[in-house]
């Protein structure tokens, strides 16, 4: 917002489950949210999606940049103490990612009942673009690092985090 001259704003932290209801109640004017919340608001006729890819465009300064907004994570102590089990877990997870990539419509059926996404919107919600640890390109890691650096620059993190060191290596 600052990059677009909107300095007179009051950002507030709001639980994601309150984004759409808060707009509907007139308590807030706009919200930056993640999926499926944007689609839920749109389908219910409460909100309109103004723009997608805002992190890439405004924080990473490249509208085509990948943004990794979530992770599948494994505790470091487990990786050290039970590496064989972790490899099995990662292989099973990769198999699931491959299934979603190859069968997106079939995968959508699992959204209802296994997530908070209601059956009425499973066909509307964009599916995640999964990127496995061994698929990251150097440019992906550079954009990932740039995103984390924002938190260091804003004094949210007390020291710089090295993103590359946080990625599982197999």
Language model features with spans:
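Short helix-capping segments at alpha-helix termini
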Residues: 2-7, 156
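Residue-level marker of alpha-helix boundaries and capping positions
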Residues: 10, 28-29, 138
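Secondary-structure end/capping motifs
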Residues: 79-158
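A generic structural signal for alpha->beta connector loops
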Residues: 6-8, 46-47
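Residue-level "edge-of-site" marker
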Residues: 14, 36, 54, 125, ...
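Short beta-strand-to-loop elements that line the ligand-binding cleft
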Residues: 8-15
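Pocket-lining segment of extracytoplasmic ligand-binding domains
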Residues: 18-111
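Hinge/cleft segment of the Venus flytrap/periplasmic-binding protein
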Residues: 160-170
């Amino acid at each position: 917002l600052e990059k677009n001259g909107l300095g007179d704003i009051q950002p507030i932290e709001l639980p994601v489950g309150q984004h759409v209801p808060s707009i509907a109640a007139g308590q807030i004017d706009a919200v930056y949210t993640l999926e499926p919340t944007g689609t839920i608001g749109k389908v219910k006729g409460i909100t309109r999606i103004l723009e997608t890819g805002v992190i890439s465009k405004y924080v990473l300064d490249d509208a085509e940049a990948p943004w990794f907004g979530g992770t599948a994570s494994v505790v470091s102590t487990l990786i050290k103490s039970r590496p064989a089990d972790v490899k099995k877990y990662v292989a099973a997870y990769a198999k699931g990612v491959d299934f979603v990539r190859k069968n997106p419509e079939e995968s959508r059926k699992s959204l209802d009942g296994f997530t908070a996404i209601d059956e009425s919107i499973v066909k509307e919600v964009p599916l995640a673009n999964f990127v496995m640890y061994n698929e990251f390109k150097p440019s992906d890691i550079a954009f990932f690092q740039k995103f984390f650096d924002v938190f260091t620059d804003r004094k949210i993190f007390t020291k710089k985090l090295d993103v590359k060191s946080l990625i599982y290596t197999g």
